[in-house]
Structure formats: structure tokens, C-alpha cells
Amino acid sequence: MSTFTFLIIGKNDNPLYEIEFPITVQKKETYVLQYIAHGSLDIVEEHVWKSNNMYLKIIDKFNKVQISSFVTAGHIKFLLLHEKKDEDAIKNFFVEVHDLYLKILLNPFYEYNKPITSTAFDAKVRKIGTKYF
Amino acid sequence: MSDPLSNPTINTTNVGGQTTTQNTIGGVGGGKSNSVGTPYTTPLQTSAYTTANSLSATNSPIPNHHMINSNSSNNLSGMVTPGGAGLQQQQSSITSSTNNLGLLGQQQPQQQQQQTLLQPFTTQSRLISASCFEFFYIEMIDCIMKSSSDKQQAHKKLDKLGFKVGHRLVERLSLDTALFPELLDAVKFICKVFWTTVFKKTIDGLKTNHKGGVFVLTDSKFQWLQHLSFDSSASNKDCSEYVQFTAGLIKGAMSNFGFKCIVTFDIQQVSTCVFTIKIES
């Protein structure tokens, strides 16, 4: 069964949020996935200033794992690590999560570029994740 | 001539087989139906059907004479209520030409009216009263000025506040647009989309020195200065604190796009503001 890891990376390459679908990934594997995501940040940075699109599609591959990326106007990076290639589902997932992220951002009690601790946000992302993956 | 507020007129219209009594007081109608299912709806209650997405007075459910720059009437005909009667709101005793139910006092064919009721209700955006916002803005600046030890500290606070608002607001506005790798595209976005959202008008002039990274934005009728009055005998007519927040807005918006900049401004004549954006290399 293929797993999906979704990460939100801040402006200074600091992690803001992380989730896995389904939640059965072993600890050891989690570190490997974080390492892969970290390695792809430079590639995202290169693509951002070349492309006009927020959705950057698949930007990197590591063994079987593919990395899709989405960058908001404020240069917050959404990364999705996946094995199956389903671009429509991934794009729709990113768009819906972007909408959720905006709602969090417009909350005056949320400090910009700080980790997202909202349980409501977490629950909604899980719901969107199960809908598409 | 009698005062319109002292003599409320009551008009009765037959809508889809039901009699609807409409009280029009001073040109603002509150629909009242004698059918059991239809609730009494005041103009302000209609806002439950709409969504907020801007910072201006246009289309606000509050009557026009309480607004600044408001020139459109709120047409609520065709909205179906539980009792089946269409609600209608008149503003300043002028009936909109697009109004399907026509003048309240006139009888219209039942067939035509029933067609009107079957049309889907198109939601109009609920917007903020510009006068309310401006009063709030003046009070906010007054509060910050009083709580600060000197003018420089107050300006820093306003700049920081504007930065936060601009940073978040521009993220929301650029939801459906592409990224801006080019500096000029980002500035154009601020001049058109961003300025229109905040002030309901685009920037009047944009001059660029692209190589030097300098952009000069001119607003000849800066909305937040237009309604300020000065004591004619006063020697000091400095009102820079009312513009500092906007400089912060621009700085926050540019920062969100990934361009660090310094924003300065100059107030010319009564309400002409010139903002200078200098990109930090």
C-alpha cells in the first residue's frame, strides 16, 4: 500500500506542518522521508523564480518516491511525497489545502511562519487526504 | 413638502396569490407579509444571504445616504422566502430599472411575477460601510498616538500593523493568480488588484525606474485623507500618521511576494499621496 507524506515548509525552510496518509508509517521511514523532502527544497527554490504557476508538479524523485510541490504567493512551500502518479488528485489536494492554509493565515491569533498547531486544520487536512488518496 | 420620515407609506402588492404589505419609511423598505410563513425582514437582516469579500461601501445593506462612494442600489427581488413572497428593498425612493417586481404600488400580471420568484437568487457581496471603517481607522490612529511616547514610535507601530495586514491580505488576494517572479508584475498587482480591494479604485499613476528598483505610486484622491478637516489657523497640518499604515500595507504586500523594500510617502495638496517603493538589493 502506497503512503503519502504532506509537509508545509515556511519561508525560512522551517517545517510548519507534517502529516502522513495512511498513518501506518514506521518511525525509521519517517526520517528518510523528511530527509528526501529536505533535499528537494533547493530544487523548489530554483523552480519558483522560473515559473509563474503555483503548482510545480513533480520536481524530484528518490528511488520510488516522487516529490510534488506547490508554492503559495507568500513563498510557503507545500510538498507531497508519493509513489503513485495521479496529477489531478494531487493538484486538487494542494488547492484545497491552500484554501485551508489561507483561513489559518487570516486568523489574527496565528503568527506567520510559525508551526500550525490547530486541531481543526489537522482534521480537515486528514479529511481531504482520505478524499483524494 | 412633507417630511418622508413622518409619513410612512404603505403599499400592497399581490405576489403569487399572496398579499404583501410593504412599509416604506424614508425610502428604505422593510418587507412585511401577512402570510404566516414569511418572516419580517429588515434591510440589515438580508445580509445573512450574502458573503463578505471586500472593504467598501458598495452594495451594503445600509441605505445609500449613510455611505461614501456608494452608487448602486441593493436589488433583492427574486429572493424566495419560506412564505413564497419575493422581498424587495427600495433605496432613497428610487426604484432600480433592473427590478423585476416594478414599483411597489403597481399591479403586475401574476404569471410574470411567478416567473420572477422561480429565478435563482444571485448573492450580492456584503461589504463594509466605508464611513464606519473610516471612523474606526481614525480612532485606531488616535489610540496609537496616545499610547506612544513620541511620533516616531507611533509611526513604527502603524507601519508594523500595516505590514501584518498587507502581508496576509495579499496572500488572500493572490489565491487565483499566478506567482510573480518579476518585480514589475508584483507592483502592478498592488496598483490594480490590491488597491482596488482596499480603496475601490486603482492607483492613479505609476512611474518606474526599473534598473534602480524605484517605483512611484500616485493616488490623487487618497480616501483616508479626503474627510479630514484642519483648523485653518493651525500652523502644523501634518497628517502623516494617517498614511503610515498604508505604507506598511504596501511593504507587507511586497514582502509577501519576496521583495524587501523601503516605502516612503509624501502628502501633496489636500489628499494627494505619493508612495515611493525602493527595493533593497
UniProtKB/Swiss-Prot annotation, chain A:
One Pfam family per UniProt: Sedlin_N
InterPro entries referenced in this protein's UniProt entry, alphabetically: Longin-like_dom_sf, Sedlin
Record-linked CDD domains: TRAPPC2_sedlin (cd14825)
Keywords recorded for this protein, A-Z: Cytoplasm, Endoplasmic reticulum, ER-Golgi transport, Golgi apparatus, Transport
Transmembrane segments: none
One cellular-component annotation, GO: cytoplasm
Disulfide bonds: none
Subcellular location: Cytoplasm, Perinuclear region; Endoplasmic reticulum; Golgi apparatus
GO biological process, one term: endoplasmic reticulum to Golgi vesicle-mediated transport
Record's function text: May play a role in vesicular transport from endoplasmic reticulum to Golgi.
PANTHER family: TRAFFICKING PROTEIN PARTICLE COMPLEX SUBUNIT 2
Protein family according to the UniProt entry: Belongs to the TRAPP small subunits family. Sedlin subfamily.
Subunit structure of this chain's protein: Part of the multisubunit TRAPP (transport protein particle) complex.
Record's protein name: Trafficking protein particle complex subunit 2
